[in-house]
Amino acid sequence: TSCETHQICGRKIIYRDGTTNTQEIDYCRCSGDTDCPKDDVNEISFVDWSYWEVSYYTCLTQAGNYHYCNEGAAVQPGAGPIIYRQNNVEHPYKMNCRCNPCWINKARCCTPGT
């Protein structure tokens, strides 16, 4: 899947729930963005896959293209922490619900032509 009006940030991110759901996704940014995300996380292990789905789509339904969760509190409060796995070490990390850059293979969250 190409990024169409978006630009690929030049890496893949693997989403896992620890069991069966593993997916390689093009990580894109809109052409209007100045840079790519600055985290170095390559593998992200979510406590619960369905929780990630709910959180992600809830994020997409928020008003505007740029929506952030508040200091690590997911869009579904109290649902539990999101764990990033980096270098085989699990650690809590602020959930980024920004809808642009977007995960183009999951949903198109940027306005066409922007």
UniProtKB/Swiss-Prot annotation:
Keywords, alphabetical: Disulfide bond, Ion channel impairing toxin, Neurotoxin, Secreted, Toxin
GO MF term list: ion channel regulator activity; toxin activity
Entry annotated with the keyword Ligase: no
Main location per the UniProt record: secreted
Tissue specificity comment: Expressed by the venom duct.
PTM summary: Contains 6 disulfide bonds.
Compartment(s) where it occurs, according to its Swiss-Prot or TrEMBL record: Secreted
Gene Ontology CC annotations of this record: extracellular region
Free-text domain note: The cysteine framework is C-C-C-C-C-C-C-C-C-C-CC.
The protein's role, per its UniProt record: Acts as a neurotoxin by inhibiting an ion channel.
Protein name: Turripeptide OL22
